[in-house]
Structure formats: C-alpha cells, structure tokens
Design a protein with these regions (language model features):
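Bacterial Sec-dependent N-terminal signal peptides
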Residues: 1-25
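Extracellular/oxidizing-compartment recognition motifs
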Residues: 23-106, 110-521, 528-529, 545-546, ...
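Alpha-helical support elements that line or immediately flank enzyme active sites
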Residues: 199-203, 213, 391-410, 453-458, ...
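Active-site acid/base region of carbohydrate-active enzymes
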Residues: 208, 300-307, 460-502, 508, ...
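C-terminal capping/lid segments that line or modulate ligand- or cofactor-binding pockets
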Residues: 253, 321-322, 522, 540, ...
C-alpha cells in the first residue's frame, strides 16, 4: 500500500494551504496547457482543478479576471475580462468572453470559486497565456546554404527500401549537391543598447535545429520542431527570453541545422527517401525594452553560415562529427566570421506555419554501462541495461585525427556482436578527435532503438595500448516526448508488473514527434497503435496537447477522396493495403471521440467532424452492399503461419466492422454537436452496415461469426453489432475457442483490444487472468522470460524484426480499468463522474493505480487481508464516483470505520456506493 500512502501524502501537501471548509483553484490551464506561449484560439478555453480538505466538496460558482499586466492582476483589475460571478459547477473549458485579444500579446489571469456551502476561496495563483501571431505577422524569410533548385534533391514519396536498389539510391545521392544535406551553422550578430524587458523568439529550423543566444542553448528540446507533413504544416517554436539572456552591446544568435525527416536522402541505411528541400531556417525575435520601444531581429540575407563539424547526419543512418572542424566561440561575440559565407534566401516550405502546441521531445533519462565484454583484444560490447530510443554520449581521449566508431543495436548475434540485421543497417556514429584532453560528444540529429553498444580498436578506461584512443566513459540517453506521465499501476502479480514496465518502456521509446511503430527501422506514425492502445495511453500519459497535433497531422494527410492513409505524416507511400486499411484510417474518427471521453473536451469533434464524415463517406465508396473488403485485417494474428496479413479471420469482416464503427461514432458526434441532418444520415448508415455485416458474416445456426476465430467473434460483441438475442451464444463460442487453444489468444495487432475488452466487459476477467498469467508464447510472460526490457513486434521475439514495438500493449487498459477498476462514465466525460469497480482475479492479493484526470488525482488501491477486502479510493473535488464492490450482496461494508448505506447493482451483481470527493477507506468482509 506504499503507493497509496504516497498519493495521500502528495494530496495532503497540496491542500495544506487550504483551511478547513475552504476550496482552492489550482493548476490553471489555457487551452489545456500551463502558461502557453502560442495560443491560436482568439477565445481560448480556461480550466482549473480544485482542492479541499473536506469531503464532498464542489464548486457552485466562479469569477475570472484577465488582465493586460501582472501589476493590474495583483490589484484585482481585470481590464481585459471580469467574468463576474458565474453560478455553475463547471471548472473546465470556460470560453474566454472578454475584450478582443491581440496577436503576439501576453495576458494574465486568475480565478476564485465558491464552494457548496457558499464560502468563497482565495484567489488562485496567477497564470498567463500569449496569443500567437498570424503567419502574415511573422512574414517569414527562409535562409540556408543552398537553394532547393540548386540542390537537385529527388521529389516524390515512393522511394523506399522495398522498391529501391543500391544503384538507384546512389544515383540520387550523386545527382544531388552534398551541401543540400550537410549540417550548417548560422549566426547573426545584433546589438542591445537599452534595458530589455522581455524578448520573444519564433523559430523553425528544418529538419531540426539547436538555437543559442550568446553561446547558451535556448530550451531543452531535442529534434525540434516536431515532425509534420511539411507540404501542409510547418511547426515553429516559441521561446520567452529575459534581460539576463542578453548583454549590453554585442550579442549573437547561433543556429545549428540538421536534416531530420525534412531531408532523408543520405548514405547508409534509410527506410525511404523523401526531401522537402535542403536544411532551412526561419527566425524572428521581438525585443521589448523597458522604455516601451521594440526591435525586430529576423532571418534575412545579412546572416552568415558555415559548415558545421557534423559531417554526416541522417535520422535513419547515424551521425558523424569531426572535432577538428569546430570553430570555438562561433555563437558568441568577438568571433571572426570573415571566412563564413552569406546565406541564400530559400524557397519557403509549402506548409502553413503553425505554432507547435504539443510538448517537445527531450532527454528524459540517462543510463550507465551495466556490463561490458571484451570479445577480443580492444573489441568491446557494452550492455546499457535498457532498450530505448536515443543516442550515446561518449568521453574519449586520444591523438588528433584518431576516430571512434560507435555501433548500436537492440540485440546480439550468437558470437556476442551487435545485430542490426532486423532493425536497419548500417547505422553508426563516428567521432574524430581533436586531441585536446578528454573530449565529450553527444549526437544531435539522429536517434536509434538500442540496448547494446559495440566499439572496436579502443582502450576502455585504461590506456593499455598507447597506439589506440581510450574510451573514458559511455552513457545512453533515453529520449521521448515530455508530455508527462498521468498514471501508475502495480499489483501482486509479478508478470503483470513486468508487463506494465515492458509496455511503457516501448511506449516511451516510440513517443517522439509522433507515436512511431519502432525507433529504429521505420520511425513511422502507423495510426492503428494510437486508437487500439488509446485507453492505456491515456491512463499512462498526459496527451491533452499531443493528440490535437496528431489530429492536425491526420487532417493534413487526408486525401481529397477522403482516404486517411495508414501512416501519418505520410512521408512515404507504400501503396495498396499498406496505405489504405480501414483499421488504421478509422483512427481519424475514433481519436476525437476518445479525447472527448477522457478530457471532457469536444473541440476535436467540432474541428475535425468534416474529416470524420469524409472518411466514412470514402469507405462507403469502397463498399459493395455495405461490405468493405480491403486492408490488412487483424495484422500479425497469432498461429503457426508467418506473421503479416490476417490469416485467422476474414479481412472483409475486419474492414467492415471498422466501417460500421466509424459510421456509429460519426453519428454520435453529430448528435452531440447538434447536427441533426448528419446524425440521421450516419445513424441510418450505421444501421444498414450492421444489417449487412450480420447477413454476410453471422451464421444463425452455429451462432458464429466469420471463421469462428477469436477476432471474428469478439469484434461484433465489442462493437455491439451482434443482435442481443445471440450475444450469449457468440460469447460461448468465443470462450470455447479460447479453452480449446489452452487459454491462449489467436488475435493480432487489431484484435487484441477487442478480445481483451470483450472478456473484461462481459464478466470474463478470470479468463483474461489465465490468458496472461504464464511464461509461454503467445504472452507477455514469454518476453519477460526472454530477458527483454521492451515489448517486441511479435510474441516470440526470435521471429520478429523490432524489439521495441508497443502495438501489442493493449492489456494496459485491463490493468487500469479492470484490475484497479478506474472506469470512465461515457455520460459524464472527462471523469466528471466515474466508476471504481476492481476485479479480484486468480490468486491476486492487491492492485493499485492512480490517474491524473483533468479534475485531479483519481486513485484506487485494494488488498485482501485477514478475511477482508479493503479498498482505498481518492476522488477529486467537484466530481463523484460510483463504487462497485466485488463482494456478496450481504457483506458488511464500512467506510472509514463506519457502517455505510449501500446500494446494489442487479446488472453487475455487486454492492454499490455513491461518493463525492475525498479520500476513503472501504472495508468489506469476504
């Protein structure tokens, strides 16, 4: 119960500032972000959480002040908006309704609330938001070393490894100018002669950039800006600077550029070739002085550039660095740049400039060497202890001109050397020494999925061979998106605990600019993983600002005919079912609804409803009598066959069920949004698809769907396609197949969620327990027994390519919703009301989870002890929960030691409690 004690302690610390009987607004957000620097909406939504020492606390009214300065806000002068007292319990997504907001302007706000007893709170702490500029305000000029026309880079998105040979690849490389893919440094001196109040930087460096002011890095991002389809959207980043970032007199802006996904043409391994142009920079800085004057420094023809010491950089192939090409102090004043060249004005990317509102990728963890083996003299293989996405940091000592090559990989060959055959080769990092003591280097523009590092022709630690350089130190940097974690889970079952860890290490490894399939071979945003793992992702990570960016990418990638491609951004067109598979494309329909359910925010439904309709309409054009027959089906379903296309279940059954689900959710969205005509259209369409599906795939005599596979029977139950009178019979067929298979699954990437949740939602959690509580394949336990630290692409790692895939991680939903019992209420989105209904299965003695909802922390922690079932729960202020207890109807139930008034759910056959906010201990006799 240690985790729950920590939760209680954190909650207690938060409310110590609140006196008895009071309530306090905390964690103020604008457009779901704390103090955002680039709000696009001119009527942004304001939200806050609430804390209180007392139970059953709620809000009955609020008052918001928005001011043009912190000074005015301190004086309670809401010169931009004074909402007055508004009587409502709503504390999320309050639409700003004050004076028109100005672009490139910062505003400050605070709120106070009244509780259920009519007592008013103290003012919250101040929060702020800055309105983004229009693209016309930015008036961007793009600069670099070479124009796109002079680069001779290939156009198009069909060049990939399956269709490419080395000669064709080399012909493209030879035809292009080497400067078009070279990392460059750009610098711009400027003067500051007055006292600076603040400065705001708007920057986009494509593919990726590193920004310095006077030699000091600005921000902590890696691989900024985040990936987009640069023909449709180009992200820019915003930074606030203060007077301490400048010095009186001469100052210098420095920018380092790399290729990223913007320009993947390169030697060595690459999954595909795509080039939107050579590296390019847009920069604008607005400096405000204390005297009220302003100054603009922006990218133009006065900037200079030079080749950087990064002599090779490829998002797929690695990175090389020659320290002898360093130019010390190039980003600071006093540097002589007479040998630098003037930049050229470049053709602007085609995409619309948009502020990056999703969180950046950063270095989140660092790992030391776990073990090292010297396979032969001066030939070392290092185990870093964790498979991850990232890059190494090396410290070396040697003579000028000596070089070190760092190979990385997920696994090892039989002889103990690194194995890149499955994950894309060759991939490595080269560093050439300048011979100046101990030198430290960290790559900047390339990452890979790896656990093992191989380095040849070196001394390690001690300089035994004077002719070789010495590796002094080695570390692994784990990079992933900085969105932050939203939940935690643990239980008495060690297989489940380690499974949770495996899955989350894989999620983190693939949580980059987009959710990728793997961090080495492809690094592509295959869509199905997001929606099929959606609830598990939501419970574990804060995706409030990430998913809107995902939907923008989906919108950008949607074709004119309505097709949503399987990969987003669609850097490469693989064609056929790998471009057009309904289970992947329907993500554009499912995600806005899932976002609404978890965050209580309908903005994605409102904004992307046309996208949803257009995709369902597209599937209608692909159907015959409402049956859709194309796609990948239940990809990688399990059996004796080779993994790939669905073999156990009809592809048409899979495609048509997702066509139905898309129409069904589009109808629900239309109803919510008050679009009556659309609701009637898609409600009718969903009904017709359902009828056609049952006519085509259901056998009324055997009560089986399709091939009677686990996928075939679970999908219609999950989606409520099966007619009610047949549901139990279909369930029995499903259970019979599971039993026949020895309580093992046969579903794949698509089917796992439907199988798991069909069992969980229909009282078969014991079956789920047996299905996963073992060390055999198919099963998570087999990968644990195999000694892996991340989830793999196939249940048997020896058969798959990637050892860092989260596509099979759908059990996370079961951990949180069933074992811990935290379940949302679709009728009260955002967990305004929710259920806590833990399932006690197998020989488990405890389970616990917490989830940071938009209203605050939700926690559930149960244990079986001394003949009692003890459940501890935390319910956020301004919410309510229904507790469903896994005990008999006549069990004695106490809350905090006192006998409780208990209801009973005939449907679930469980005693129930209705509770308001607070922390409670519930005891039941077993």
């Amino acid at each position: 119960m240690k985790n729950f004690k920590n939760i209680v302690l954190a909650f207690s610390l938060l409310v110590t500032v609140v006196s008895k009987g009071q309530i306090l607004p905390v964690r103020l957000t604008t457009e779901m972000a704390e103090n955002p620097l680039a709000v696009v909406e001119n009527k942004p939504k304001l939200s806050w959480q609430l804390v209180s020492k007392e139970s059953n606390a709620s809000q009955v009214a609020y008052l918001i002040l928005v001011a043009s300065s912190e000074e005015k806000l301190k004086m309670d002068d809401g010169d931009i908006w004074n909402s007055g007292r508004v009587n409502t319990d709503k504390n999320l997504h309050i639409v700003y309704s004050g004076k028109p907001l100005k672009n490139e302007t910062k505003y400050f706000w605070k709120v106070k609330v009244w509780n259920q007893a009519g007592k008013v709170s103290k003012w919250s702490r101040n929060a702020s938001f800055r309105i983004a500029p229009l693209e016309s305000d930015l008036n961007p000029t793009w600069i670099g070393a070479i124009t796109k026309a002079d680069s001779h880079l290939p156009e198009g998105r069909t060049y990939h490894t399956a269709t490419f040979n080395r000669e064709k690849k080399n012909s493209f490389i030879n035809a292009s100018d080497s400067l078009s893919r070279r990392s460059i440094m750009l610098r711009k001196p400027f003067e500051v002669e007055k006292a600076v109040k603040e400065a705001v930087v708007y920057i986009s460096g494509l593919g990726h950039y590193e920004l310095t002011i006077n030699g000091k890095k600005v921000g902590n991002s890696q691989f900024a800006p985040l990936w987009t389809d640069y023909d449709k959207t180009v992200n820019y980043n915003v930074y606030e600077l203060s007077a301490r970032d400048f010095q009186k007199g001469d100052n210098v802006i420095g920018v380092l550029l790399g290729n990223g996904m913007y320009n993947t043409l390169a030697e060595r391994y690459t999954k595909f070739f795509v080039s939107f142009g050579p590296p390019t920079l847009f920069f604008k800085m607005k400096i405000k002085y204390n005297d009220g004057s302003e100054e603009i420094v922006k990218s133009d023809g006065t900037w200079k550039y030079s080749k950087s010491p990064i002599t090779y950089n490829s998002i797929f192939g690695g990175e090389d660095y020659n320290a002898n090409f360093e130019q010390k102090g190039w980003g600071s004043k006093g540097f002589k740049d007479r040998d630098w060249k003037k930049v050229v004005i470049q053709e602007a990317p085609k995409g619309v400039l948009r502020p990056q509102t999703a969180p950046p990728v950063t270095i989140q963890k660092q790992y030391e060497v776990k073990t090292v083996k010297e396979l032969k003299p001066n030939f070392y293989v290092f185990d870093m202890g964790q498979n991850l996405s990232g890059f190494p940091t090396i410290k070396v000592k040697g003579e000028r001109g000596q070089s070190i090559r760092v190979w990385v990989a997920e696994g090892l060959n039989e002889e103990g050397t690194i194995a890149q055959g499955r994950s894309g080769k060759p991939y490595y990092y080269d560093y050439t020494l300048k011979g100046d003591g101990v030198e430290e280097w960290t790559p900047k523009f390339s990452f890979y999925g790896y656990q093992y590092v191989q380095i040849e022709n070196i001394n390690y630690k001690d300089a035994k061979n004077k002719d070789l350089l010495t590796l002094v130190d080695l570390k692994s940097n784990f990079i992933y998106n900085s969105a932050g974690e939203a939940g935690s889970f643990a239980c008495s079952n060690e297989i489940f605990n380690k499974t949770h860890e495996l899955i989350n290490n894989s999620i983190k490894s693939n949580f980059q600019s987009v959710f990728t399939d793997c961090p080495q071979r492809e690094k592509l945003g295959w869509l199905e993983e997001i929606q099929l793992n959606g609830p598990g992702l939501m419970f574990n990570y804060n995706l409030q600002n990430f998913l809107p960016a995902t939907m923008q990418n989906i919108s950008d990638s949607q074709r004119e005919n309505g097709l949503i491609p399987s990969i987003v951004p669609e850097y490469i067109i693989f064609g056929g079912d790998f471009t057009d598979s309904p289970e992947w494309g329907v993500t554009g329909v499912i995600l806005p609804w899932m976002y609404y359910e978890y965050y209580g925010d309908a903005s994605l439904l409102e904004k992307y409803f046309p996208i949803m309709k257009k995709y369902v309409d597209y599937l209608e054009t692909k159907s015959t009598n409402h049956i859709v027959s194309h796609g990948l089906g239940d990809w990688y379903d399990y059996g004796t066959h080779a993994a790939g296309y669905s073999k156990n279940s009809p592809i048409a059954l899979s495609a048509t069920s997702h066509y139905y689900y898309g129409a069904y959710l589009t109808a629900k969205a239309a109803k919510l949004l008050g679009k009556t005509e659309d609701y009637e259209k898609y409600e009718t369409l969903a009904s017709e698809i359902k009828t056609a599906f049952n006519r085509e795939f259901f056998n009324p005599e055997t009560k089986q769907y399709g091939t009677n596979s686990q996928f075939s029977n679970s999908v219609p139950v999950f989606m409520n396609i099966v007619e009610p009178q047949y549901k139990e019979a279909v369930m029995q067929n499903l259970l019979a197949d599971i039993k026949e298979k020895g309580d093992r699954l046969t579903t794949g990437d698509v089917g796992n969620r439907y199988l798991f949740q069909t069992l969980a939602r229909n009282g078969e959690n014991e079956t789920m327990y047996r299905m996963h509580n073992h060390y055999d394949a198919p099963g998570y336990g087999f990968q644990i027994k195999f000694g892996l630290t991340t989830l793999t692409e196939q249940w048997d790692p020896r058969k798959g390519n990637s050892w860092n895939h989260f596509m099979l991680g759908q059990i996370e939903e079961w951990f949180f919703q069933s074992l811990a019992g935290i379940m949302s209420d679709p009728e009260k989105p955002g967990f305004k009301h929710f259920f806590i209904q833990p399932e006690v299965v197998g020989d488990m003695t405890f389970a616990k989870a917490d989830y940071e909802s938009v209203y605050g922390k939700i926690a559930s922690s149960w244990e079986k002890k001394d003949g009692k079932f003890i459940l501890k729960v935390q319910i956020p202020v301004n919410t309510k929960a229904t507790i469903k207890l896994p005990v008999s109807k006549d069990s004695e139930i106490k809350i905090d030691g006192k006998k409780a008034g208990v209801g009973y759910s005939e449907k679930d056959k469980k005693p129930t409690l209705e509770l308001g906010s607070g922390i409670y201990t519930i005891e039941c006799k077993l």
